[in-house]
């Protein structure tokens, strides 16, 4: 951990103790922890670093435990990313430390932060699970060290809770200003919680640039032993500039070969994209053939887990509102628990010569939860007939009756057009958790 980051978190915790901190409610995540309390499983809180995992566990959930009768000496907290607890990264030392604190038969709550910093952490967690009066919670910032291990090592005894940067509604609740100003702020700088207390533009920009290079990208490079730092750095820039557009590793490789005379193979590029996804920096949206009811492996789309980080990577240039809106909607849907794909509808149309040709129309998002499905288009506006047709044509060729929604920029309340499609403003969508059920 960087010294300035350590000092920041120390200050954050001290401020919280004084009662002066702006508390951002994260009730959805807190309720998930409460629902899973004492269920005999390891609760694994995952997500990008600095998105609020530690605050959720060590502040909000600990406060809940204390307010509901748990004694402070029955809550064992260990933050494994700090230099002051370096010795506890040794699995045997950590396990012994915890065991020594368990001195009676009452329930103990073990809170371990950034558990991937400990070698063989799976063995420690499995050992803790064998203690009857222990309830274990851990956080981690890399899915390869967590999600796969949850499945293989815990054999059904791991319960993953995914945390995202602040949604707009969470951000707005702490912003203290008007919607339009908050929306501009969010679209530029994103939803990392630390930004809430920053007062000027330069401070926010410097923070986002610094944390990307010195924390996120550095973690990816070091964990995966990447030798050529320049190549993956440029790859990140390419992905940042191409949010919402199909990504082809072979084409990227060819670009490196012709423009940089670099042998950056498509296999290496694919592996590096996987590393970025495992670190929760980006998220993959699969392409789904709606008529054929099958997935298409080629030309996947990638979105950044936070638009502020994406913008920082490009020095706050290339601020295309529609693509940024699309990224925000994608992240919002994930945070609400939907699975999200990019839809494709194949149609036969006549070209300017009157010949029938096959054409692929796109649906920005196909979202699913349980038996429910929604088709969603994201548009900056629908002010012209041409723009309306562009968004509606895909819907017209979908052979089912699931709800079809267009989200547009602005504050308009939802309404239905003559074809039954729901049109709603971004404000309504973001600030109403059940907005898709209008």
Where are these regions (language model features)?
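Pre-Walker A adenine-sensing motif
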Residues: 19-38
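Conserved ATPase-coupling elements of RecA-like P-loop NTPase cores
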Residues: 87-90, 116-125, 148-150
């Amino acid at each position: 951990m960087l010294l300035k980051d350590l000092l920041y978190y120390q200050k954050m915790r001290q401020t919280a103790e004084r009662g002066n901190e702006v508390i951002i409610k994260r009730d959805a995540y807190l309720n998930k922890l409460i629902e899973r309390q004492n269920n005999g499983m390891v609760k694994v809180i995952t997500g990008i670093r600095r998105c609020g995992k530690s605050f959720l566990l060590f502040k909000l959930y600990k406060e809940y435990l204390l307010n509901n009768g748990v004694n402070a000496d029955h809550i064992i907290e260990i933050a494994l990313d700090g230099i002051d607890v370096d010795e506890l990264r040794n699995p045997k030392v950590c396990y012994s430390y915890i065991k020594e604190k368990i001195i009676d038969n009452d329930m103990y709550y073990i809170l371990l932060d950034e558990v991937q910093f400990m070698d063989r952490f799976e063995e420690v967690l499995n050992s803790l699970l064998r203690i009857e009066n222990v309830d274990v919670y851990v956080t981690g910032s890399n899915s390869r060290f967590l999600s796969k291990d949850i499945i293989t090592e815990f054999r059904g005894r791991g319960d993953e809770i995914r945390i995202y940067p602040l949604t707009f509604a969470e951000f707005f609740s702490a912003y203290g200003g008007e919607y339009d100003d908050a929306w501009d702020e969010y679209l530029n700088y994103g939803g990392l919680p630390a930004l809430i207390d920053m007062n000027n533009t330069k401070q926010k920009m410097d923070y986002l640039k610094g944390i990307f290079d010195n924390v996120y990208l550095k973690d990816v490079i070091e964990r995966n032993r990447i030798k050529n730092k320049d190549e993956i750095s440029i790859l990140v820039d390419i992905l940042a500039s191409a949010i919402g557009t199909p990504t082809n590793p072979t084409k990227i490789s060819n670009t490196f070969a012709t423009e940089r005379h670099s042998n950056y193979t498509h296999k290496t590029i694919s592996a590096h994209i996987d590393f970025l996804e495992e670190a929760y920096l980006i998220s993959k949206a699969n392409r789904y053939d709606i008529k054929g009811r099958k997935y298409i492996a080629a030309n996947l789309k990638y979105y950044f887990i936070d638009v502020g980080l994406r913008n920082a990577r490009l020095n706050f240039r290339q601020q295309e509102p529609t693509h940024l809106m699309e990224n925000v909607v994608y992240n919002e849907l994930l945070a609400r628990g939907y699975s999200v794909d990019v839809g494709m509808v194949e149609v036969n149309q006549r070209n300017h010569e009157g010949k029938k040709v096959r054409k692929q129309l796109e649906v920005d998002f196909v979202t699913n939860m349980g038996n429910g499905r929604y088709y969603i288009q994201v548009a900056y506006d629908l002010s012209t007939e041409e723009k309306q047709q562009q968004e509606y044509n895909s819907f017209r060729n979908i052979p089912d009756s699931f709800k079809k929604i267009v989200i547009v920029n602005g504050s308009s309340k939802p309404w239905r057009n003559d074809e039954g499609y729901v049109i709603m403003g971004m404000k309504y969508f973001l600030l109403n958790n059940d907005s898709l059920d209008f």
